[in-house]
């Protein structure tokens, strides 16, 4: 299979046969962190901006809308079984799911979509569903918001290596860069995470 992928001019990522494989196991702790920020009352556009400034092609809430809230719930449940990582806060996603807000495909999720484009700042109806606080209870700056978003992805990457789900740090790079489109500062998520963790 790897040889066939190479013939297509692509690169394969070999991972152990576990729910979510490598890419989703990096992605979902990050999405979970974003939902934590939402529930703490952080402005949605700040969350999205911090993510894209760090190198993601789109913010985590928009990404959940693209995945589909229903799909995200199923994937998170599969990963959570027997995993040390935690899926996105299911009660928050369930609130959207039960309201029929499944993301872009239904025209509304975290954001409302008009003519295919998300409306900025979130939809008041969605905010009412998932944001009990009215103010930012974290009282932190963008640097801290970014740390809270991406440190769980770094920790998940270490978990993948320690458990042998992937073999090398190069596999991790391929998973987040090729699989998620993430281009972090300095180009190395693991190095960033080590520097942030050592500074705590």
Sequence positions of predicted segments:
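N-terminal glycine-rich phosphate-binding loop for ADP-containing cofactors
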Residues: 1-200
């Amino acid at each position: 299979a790897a040889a066939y992928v190479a013939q297509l001019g692509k690169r394969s990522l070999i991972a152990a046969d576990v729910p979510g494989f490598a890419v989703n196991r990096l992605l979902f702790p990050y999405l979970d962190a974003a939902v934590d920020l939402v529930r703490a009352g952080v402005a949605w556009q700040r969350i999205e901006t911090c993510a894209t400034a760090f190198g993601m092609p789109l913010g985590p809430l928009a990404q959940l809308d693209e995945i589909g809230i229903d799909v995200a719930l199923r994937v998170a449940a599969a990963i959570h079984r027997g995993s040390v990582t935690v899926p996105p806060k299911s009660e928050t996603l369930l609130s959207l799911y039960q309201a029929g807000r499944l993301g872009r495909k239904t025209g509304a999720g975290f954001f409302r979509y008009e003519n295919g484009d998300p409306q900025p700042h979130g939809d008041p109806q969605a905010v009412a569903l998932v944001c009990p606080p009215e103010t930012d209870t974290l009282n932190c700056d963008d640097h801290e918001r970014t740390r809270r978003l991406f440190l769980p992805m770094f920790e998940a990457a270490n978990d993948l290596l320690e458990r042998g789900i992937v073999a090398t740090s190069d596999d991790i790079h391929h998973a987040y860069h090729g699989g998620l489109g993430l281009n972090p500062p300095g180009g190395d998520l693991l190095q960033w995470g080590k520097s942030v963790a050592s500074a705590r």
